Amino acid sequence: MYAVIYDNKVLVGPMNWNRGMFQGALERKGIQYPLPRTAPNNLPLTINEHAKIMRVDEIRPQMNPLVEFYYGPLWDITEEAAIANYEVHDSPIESMRYNLKQVAAQARYNKEVLGTTATIQDQEVTIDTNRGARDIFVQKYLLMADSDLVNWKFPETWLTLTKQDLSLAVQAGAQYIQNCFDWELNISEQIDQAETKEQLLAITIVE
């Protein structure tokens, strides 16, 4: 990372080497100086008594992006480099809540599509709960007559299902998915009730 420095103040940067941006910054100060296409090995590059291009060293403390953000950079210009210091500040409480609700929604979706089990014809079978698979269960159930039979392949075995058998799979999947959404609602209510960063971070979302 690099920065254009003018009278010990940063004009442009920190950024990757960008000859066009750097020359533009110099020209706005009335300085014409042909810069190389790629970053020079020897830095700082002194342009004149006012301007130079320096390597940037960033100092970023550990930060939790769900509830905090970086403030800065606050510059410290040394002989060798421009030091970009960042401070960690708390995000507004509404931003914290929004971010944690996004985490909860993703966690709910991950649970939602994991699948569940049901006992059909005295056998425990896995019910696929991803959104495509559960639509197939429901559509087939709606199309079946009461007397129809259907051969169904579960991960564990093949079963010949009656409409009543298939309803057990549909009900198991629907109840499992509802439980996932109820879990997310509970987490969302806890988030809304929290008033501080510490209270928000005490909520267990992902185990």
Language-model features: locations:
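A preference for well-ordered globular domain cores
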Residues: 1, 5-207
